[in-house]
């Protein structure tokens, strides 16, 4: 959630007045910041979410400092104990965050020094907040990706499970939102499994690229201390240290790539949500959503509103906005670090929360929805949906060129339209008046079920294909129906 607008006359704003400069960096300053400077500069209101990653990074850094001789074993033990106590304080809600200390890094470091004294002040040796925050942020995004991957897999399992259940359930396939050809409901659901699989691949790729450790890059140029960057990288489960200190502390392409992947995934969820909204409407009547994912109206007692689906549909605007916002922040920044980069976290936190909610809501809707199969079957045969099957029959059985078959079928559709009937209701004589070679075998391909059964090409909607694909996905995802 975005911070409320700052009231420069409020107690919060004036709380900075008269304070000394930040004790972590204020040695060369004679006085503290202006009230509004304190407000705009502080990020603790949102970056405190990084506390677990910050403590984990500090523990790895401290262990490395002790190994290379920059901390004693006693100091390391004190730091570990102090950071453990601070983690407990934060976890239990007892930690008092100070906006005057700006961010989560300074808040934890100041509290550590308060608890254990000199050893706490040694922790920041060979480290800058620049490489510290870059490390924390990569750890946080990596953790977020892992969580979203699990959620996405769960949604894919739900879709594949329902697809297997409805492998042979006819429904209309649309182009231009006009009935085009029959498909199965299972085939339609599996289309989203494929999309989500690619979304998982993009997140997996983003995770692989971000998995390098900035710690040890210091402010921008590295450090003169004899540190072991590979030790800290390994301790934090990174693949390797970053190769260039300037790049490590200044770029946020890993966050942008993450937001880009989320934007694409949100687009896919938005498409599915839109279809759920349509399918649940009275004119379609394809599905009924459970009470758990619908709401009522304050004035119209009969209403059953698909609010969960509508909110998922809308989240794309928020997530894509976060992506474009951060892209705009980063586009003109010279090397190396600039305070602009503080604006990197809120978009990522916001987009992650939006995606987490969207996946959970969509998973629940898919599991709980009821398919109105009779209605789906009725609409699947509307709009001359088997016309393509007729054209294919002319090509296959009578060796008519496809363009000629297309023309003949179009004339037969026009004839049926004029009579107000389906293609299958035309008599053989009427069909032969357009194409004399047509025989009674044509009627075998004009049913919805025959159309579905014939689509046996790889990736097609034949029920046997759909059943096989659904079972294959469930096996890949580690669950059988």
Curated annotation (Swiss-Prot):
One of its GO terms (molecular function) is argininosuccinate lyase activity. It comes from the Bacteria. GO terms for cellular component: cytosol. Belongs to the lyase 1 family. Argininosuccinate lyase subfamily. One of its GO terms (biological process) is L-arginine biosynthetic process. This is Argininosuccinate lyase. Pathway: Amino-acid biosynthesis; L-arginine biosynthesis; L-arginine from L-ornithine and carbamoyl phosphate: step 3/3. The keyword Amino-acid biosynthesis applies. The keyword Amino-acid biosynthesis applies. Residues 1-25 are annotated as: Disordered. It is found in: Cytoplasm. Pfam families: ASL_C2, Lyase_1. Residues 1-17 have a biased composition (Polar residues). It catalyses: 2-(N(omega)-L-arginino)succinate = fumarate + L-arginine. Gene3D superfamilies: Fumarase/aspartase (C-terminal domain), Fumarase/aspartase (Central domain), Fumarase/aspartase (N-terminal domain). Its main location: cytoplasm. SUPFAM superfamilies: L-aspartase-like. It is an enzyme of class 4 (lyase). HAMAP family: Arg_succ_lyase (MF_00006). Transmembrane segments: none annotated.
């Amino acid at each position: 959630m975005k911070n409320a607008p700052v009231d420069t006359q409020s107690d919060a704003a004036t709380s900075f007045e008269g304070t000394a400069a930040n004790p972590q960096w204020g040695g060369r300053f004679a006085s503290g910041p202006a009230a509004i400077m304190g407000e705009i500069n502080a990020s603790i209101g949102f970056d405190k979410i990084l506390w677990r990653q910050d403590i984990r990074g500090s523990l790895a850094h401290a262990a490395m400092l002790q190994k290379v001789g920059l901390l004693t074993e006693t100091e390391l033990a004190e730091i570990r104990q102090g950071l453990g106590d601070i983690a407990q304080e934060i976890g239990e809600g007892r930690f008092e965050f100070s906006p005057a200390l700006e961010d989560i890094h300074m808040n934890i470091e100041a509290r550590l020094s308060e608890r254990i004294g000199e050893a706490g002040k040694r922790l920041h040796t060979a480290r800058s907040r620049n490489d510290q925050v870059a490390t924390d942020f990569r750890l946080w995004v990596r953790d977020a990706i892992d969580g979203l991957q699990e959620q996405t897999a769960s949604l894919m399992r739900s879709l594949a499970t329902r697809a297997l259940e409805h492998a042979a359930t006819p429904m209309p396939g649309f182009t231009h939102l006009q009935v085009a050809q029959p498909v199965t409901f299972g085939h339609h659901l599996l289309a989203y499994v494929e999309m989500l699989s690619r979304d998982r691949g993009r997140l997996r790729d983003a995770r692989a690229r971000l998995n390098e450790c900035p710690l040890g890059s210091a402010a921008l140029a590295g450090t003169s201390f004899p540190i072991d960057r590979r030790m800290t990288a390994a301790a934090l489960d990174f693949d390797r240290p970053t190769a260039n200190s300037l790049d490590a502390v200044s770029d946020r392409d890993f966050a942008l790539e993450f937001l880009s992947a989320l934007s694409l995934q949100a687009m896919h969820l938005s498409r599915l949500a839109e279809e759920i909204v349509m399918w649940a409407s009275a004119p379609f009547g394809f599905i009924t959503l459970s009470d758990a994912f619908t709401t009522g109206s304050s004035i119209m007692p009969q209403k059953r509103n698909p609010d969960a689906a509508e909110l998922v549909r809308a989240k794309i605007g928020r997530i894509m906005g976060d992506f474009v916002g951060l892209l705009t922040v980063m586009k003109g920044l010279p090397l190396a670090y600039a305070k602009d980069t503080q604006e990197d976290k809120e978009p990522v936190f916001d987009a992650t929360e939006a995606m987490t909610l969207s996946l959970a809501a969509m998973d629940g809707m898919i599991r709980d929805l009821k398919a109105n199969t009779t209605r789906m079957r009725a609409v699947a045969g509307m709009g001359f949906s088997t016309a393509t099957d007729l054209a294919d029959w002319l090509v296959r059985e009578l060796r008519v060129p496809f363009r000629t078959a297309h023309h003949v079928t179009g004339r037969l559709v026009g004839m049926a339209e004029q009579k107000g009937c389906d293609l299958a209701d035309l008599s053989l004589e009427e069909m032969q008046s357009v194409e004399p070679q047509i025989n009674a075998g044509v009627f075998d391909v004009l049913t919805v079920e025959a159309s579905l059964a014939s689509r046996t090409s790889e990736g097609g909607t034949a029920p046997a294909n759909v059943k096989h694909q659904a079972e294959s996905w469930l096996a890949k995802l580690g669950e059988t129906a």
